[in-house]
Amino acid sequence: MVKLLKKLTWKDFILAAVAFVFIIVQVWLSLTMPDYMSEITKLVQTKGSKMNDILIAGGKMLACALGSLLAAVCTSICASKISSNFSANLRGQVFHKVQSFSMEEIGNFSTASLITRSTNDITQVQMLIVMGLEVLLKAPIMAVWALCKISTKNWQWTASTGVAVVVLLSFVCVCVAVALPKFKKLQSLTDNLNRVTRENLTGLNVVRAYNAEGYQQKKFNDANDELTKTQLFANRTMGTMMPGIQMVMNGLMLAIYWIGAYLISNAQMFDKLTIFSDMIVFTQYAMQVVMSFMMLVMIFVLLPRASVSAKRINEVLDMPLSIKDGTKENGIDGKKGEVEFRNVSFCYPDAEKDVIEDISFTAHKGETIAFIGSTGCGKSTVINMIPRFYDATKGEVLVDGVNVKEYTQKALRNKIGYVSQKAVLFTGSIKSNVAYGDNGTKGFTDDVVKQAIETAQAKEFVDKTEGGVDAFVAQGGSNFSGGQKQRLSIARAICRHPEILIFDDSFSALDYKTDRVLRDTLRKTCADATRFIVAQRIGTIRDADKIIVLDDGKIVGMGKHNELMETCEVYRQIAYSQLSKEELA
């Protein structure tokens, strides 16, 4: 928690200092009111007192109450501004950090957990800051100030208040000690419930297709029940605080009045009024002490959860990055568009075996390099090393003659147009999706966007869509078919005019005719770009300049289609499983 609070700016500390001044004023005015109450009590009991004197004392008491209220409002405004600025900055830092994560770091958490940490956890810390400035500063000041005032009164009253304070502290500490472990568990259970809910929503069609609603409901109920039980235990434990404090407060009042009655009964007549007046004042001060502890209870309710949330936020912010920026912006002259793999191997964290092993090849400017092989043989892993989604554990990957680790990530990725296996569209318009991202230019003109759409064979359906390139795209592109989303994703990559185009099984949602026309168009319009294609269909890659066949993470064949049909058994088996001998001829 302290580590996060260090992220407060100097402006926040100035506001905190202003809030502290208002708190001092508020406490002083609140603790002055009992003095005027004592004065009014004496005036009422004294013969010959003027009503004007009572009204003046009452007016001063009212002024103190209004002043205390105004100071409390000012404190609240300062606290709200500090907490809002802090949470906004913290959310920005978490988002920026997550943006820097590689697939390895994201895998260490989970999407559901990262969302919870970026929203709910930061809100918990924000609430603690608000309550901390409004209550945590005020309560100790109020308690100490009030105790100093009552210490000058009767020692029996002071002793009874001291006993009440010790009982309160012990009770609160026990409650917090019991509830804290449950609050720590609560956040992980919330992550689990979010994960189950997210899985169900994203896979709803599969769930329905297999009539698995009952199974999913059971998973949700189990996660929900465990979360509910933990919440109930934690909330019940913390919920006993208020009744416990109320009981102590009532017991303290009873003790004060009992002691007061005893003192008054044994006092001389002229001392009875003074003792009675002191008892009224002492009761008010004692209640201020107890109220201070009641305010602290509000902090203790928030503190366990906020402490856990702060730890989870720090886990994200302190996560070391496996992919670090280099310093170079440009490659070697004369090597533009060239990609080389030198004895590259890669192993996922905690895995025992390399996913790919000793991969070596060179792709020259303008060439089409295709990858094919069985599912899980490492095709996507190989091409994901070019934009540094993963870094090689052995060997080197070079772009334009420079190791990719030496580039800044921005400079490297400005050279690349990437189309993922699953087409990803963002909420906005067709134009905003095609012209998406920063490639080092000031933006894309409408003509460039339309040309990219035409090259990607998306012009026909875009023209038919109401609004054309300005047509609305729903979240995830849910208002477009799989093939349409795939073509718009391809248009987005083409629009950048990159040195390197990467298609990670990006033609799978296209029909054979569109696939063929698109590849022919790419060969003409993107002739200077080095093209990498991962595919399962022989028809998609048979015209490539170089086909790399992978099996169990190793290269088992490399060459053109006709060469591989003669020399590579794995390629030949894949080819014959899809096409007849006549079609392959």
Regions found by a protein language model. Give the residues of each.
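Helix-loop-helix
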Residues: 48-50, 59, 145, 149-166, ...
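ABC-type nucleotide-binding domain
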Residues: 332-585
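Transmembrane helix-loop-helix hairpins at lipid-water interfaces of multipass membrane proteins
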Residues: 10-74, 78, 151-156, 262-276
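Juxtamembrane helix-loop junctions of ABC transporter transmembrane domains
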Residues: 21-22, 29-38, 42, 55, ...
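A short amphipathic helical element positioned immediately N-terminal to and/or at the very start
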Residues: 1-11, 114
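Alpha-helical segments in transporter systems
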Residues: 14-36, 57, 61, 76-80, ...
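An intracellular "coupling" helix at the cytosolic face of ABC transporter transmembrane type-1 domains
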Residues: 11, 100-104, 120-129, 133, ...
